[in-house]
Amino acid sequence: MKQPFIIAGLLCMLLIGTLSGCVGPVATETLTKTYAATDATVMTVSNLNGQVDITGWNGDTIVLTTVKRSSVGQADLKNINISVTTSGGHFDVKTIYTGSSMTQPSVDLTLKVPYNVTIDTVSNSNGAIHLTSTKGDTVLSTSNGAILVDHVNGYVSAATSNAYVEIKGTTGIDGAHTSNGAISVEVQSLRDDITIGTSNAAVTVYLNPSLNATVDAATSNARVTVEGITLNTSLLQETHVIGTLGTADHRIEIRTSNGNVYLYNL
């Protein structure tokens, strides 16, 4: 009676192996290249699966290190192309995969960029983004990966899902969004109305007391805490606070559900 079950099990294993592409030891390939840059260089980065790490440095070149990984063998690494194009002052990095849609290779991109290079956009399909000591009004987007920003000479907006967002040491922010992940941001200055939002997690916002803005902070099933900063409040409830810093030139809307909101002095 055991034979039919053995045959069925072997057939299931064969089917799984066919669908997954014969998963085996992870093949890797690491490559470092150096590129020229000027103070007028504007950079964009677009990746698939993996981490993107961009750090400013005092050199005069862009150093790009790529780490390719594939679970279906060394041959699949040839299907991963890191496209670098330079035209009209733009420096664009893009990961392109031409292999089977049944596999999910990954690429880690690590870039050292001169401090005066402007970082325009950084996008990633699945993975973290780290941005440190750079310049530019930068738009960051990914999913299933944290976004960590530290010391950027410019305004930053960040959007991800199922992961943490942290923005500190920037000129200002244009917004921060995630789901099922906490947010911690410093708001040094504003150039427009912004929203900061997540779900099922806490939001911590450090506010420059010199801001001119209306702060509207609310949560569904937790509480809003204001500490160390004075708001001219028009609404003061456990789950919803509306107050003004200076004049109401801009609006900061903060939202979460099933998580606390903390407003602190920067």
Question: For each predicted feature, which ranges?
Answer:
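All-beta strand scaffolds that present successive hydrophobic residues in beta-strands
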Residues: 43, 119-122, 173, 193-196
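Short acidic/polar N-terminal linker immediately downstream of export determinants
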Residues: 7-9, 17-62, 67-75, 99-106, ...
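Positively charged n-region of N-terminal signal peptides that target proteins for export
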Residues: 1-5, 11
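Short, surface-exposed interaction patches in beta-rich subdomains
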Residues: 174-178, 182-266
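Right-handed parallel beta-helix
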Residues: 31-38, 42, 79-155, 165-167, ...
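Short coil-to-beta strand junction motifs in C2/discoidin
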Residues: 76-78, 210
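Beta-strand repeat scaffolds of extracellular/surface proteins
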Residues: 51, 57-59, 116, 134-137, ...
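Extended beta-sheet lipid-handling architectures
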Residues: 47, 121-124, 131-133, 142, ...
